[in-house]
Amino acid sequence: MPNDTHETAPTRSIQAGDVQFAYRRFGPRGATPLLLLNYFAAHMDDWDPKITNGFATEHDVILVDYPGIGRSSGQTPSKVAALTNACVAFCRAIGLTQFDVVGFSLGGMIAQELGAEHPDLLRRIMLLGTGPRGGEGLVFDDLSVEELDDPSALLRKAFFTPSEASQASGRAYMERLKSRSADRDTSVSRQSASAELAAIREWGVIPTSDRFAMLGKIQHPTLIVHGNKDVVVMPINAFLLAEHLPNAQLIMYPDARHGAHSQHADVFLKHVKLFLQ
């Protein structure tokens, strides 16, 4: 409903193929829909309400759980291409013909695949804390799903720098994640997280030729947002995206890691507003 928010939007479901997708939709209808694609081992409640509610003042916001994640049924795909196909099936099931997309980390990989392989579905693309196929340091040999056992500590370390200002932003962000008190999403299983990690690692393998050829296929206006001290997806990946995407602009936020858009939420929302206009 138009008057719903991140905190109040009901969790809905729709069948697409063999998956029952869980999703939420809020904000004014009529404008170009804005689909949000999430990061590794994250569900709908892991989006920052300051960001989603900020989007929803002017945009028809759609959150969705990937197959096997949160309340969505099915088995989580272990390749980005398969995750992308699942997202396409979901979008068609809810009647989307064209939309803007925000892809955060893993979601940004899916957004790139959407732009390259399903260009007619997209109008504009926003890539947050992500990297190109075959980017730098994207195989994540040292990352394991066991690190998810203490998600709060992991988020504080991965999303925010040690500076006092960044840590204060991190504490505020962690509190915001609690703002939805009812109808919360379901935690992500290790099996599903492992599948997503496999998808990211497959994406990160450097090809033997035409390393960034896929990016040349993405003609959509694209906004790249990154933290200058990101320890999850190294900042060099943002520059690679900006160099090889034909119609991209890059914003690098200072003193920021993987949660740059949440740490700098106010200015980020202004940048997004300008970009989507």
What are these regions (language model features)?
Residues 62-102, 270:
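Active-site loop/oxyanion-hole signature of alpha/beta-hydrolase fold enzymes
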Residues 218, 224-226:
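Short beta-strand/loop motif that positions the catalytic acidic residue
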Residues 231-237:
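Conserved alpha/beta-hydrolase "acid-adjacent" motif
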Residues 112, 116, 123-153:
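Flexible "cap/lid" loop of the alpha/beta hydrolase fold
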Residues 184-211:
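Hydrophobic, aromatic-rich cap/lid helix
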Residues 103, 107, 111:
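Gly/Ala-rich beta-loop-alpha elbow adjacent to hydrolase catalytic centers
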Residues 248-277:
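Catalytic active-site module of serine/aspartate enzymes centered on a nucleophile-bearing elbow/loop
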Residues 19-73:
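Conserved HGGG/HGGXW glycine-rich cap/lid loop of the alpha/beta-hydrolase fold
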